[in-house]
């Protein structure tokens, strides 16, 4: 899969599947500095992924500050040929001051065995 370099950030397209619905997100950042994969609540609510009383809620911290997130499991998360089923993700506001629909963190990258080729701007 091709990676887009925009404003010094690496963007990919991610396909999320939840309860037989598919959502394609094009403004997703590859973030090797993030331990977990995180998606915008505004975007994933289109799949019916909304907070429920039993969902774990926690605070995550990053360079941009901290925010509260809730956890869900996607039926499948794919970046082109890289795909994981029954994958846990964090969901939060992601109000960072620029368009972003999600972050692909090390949890996904390592479990999927991703190889990032920065010279060719590809991930496989």
Residue ranges and their predicted role:
Residues 1-124:
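Pepsin/retropepsin-fold aspartyl endopeptidases
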């Amino acid at each position: 899969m091709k990676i887009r370099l925009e404003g010094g950030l690496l963007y990919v397209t991610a396909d999320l599947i939840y309860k037989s619905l598919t959502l394609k997100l094009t403004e997703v950042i590859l973030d090797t500095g993030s331990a977990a994969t995180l998606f915008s609540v505004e975007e994933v609510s289109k799949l019916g992924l909304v907070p429920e009383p039993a969902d774990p809620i926690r605070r995550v911290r990053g360079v941009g500050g901290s925010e509260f997130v809730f956890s869900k499991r996607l039926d499948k998360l794919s970046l082109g040929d890289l795909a994981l089923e029954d994958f846990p993700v964090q969901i939060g506001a992601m109000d960072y001051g620029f368009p972003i629909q999600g972050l692909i963190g090390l949890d996904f990258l390592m479990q999927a065995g991703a190889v990032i080729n920065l010279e060719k701007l590809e991930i496989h």
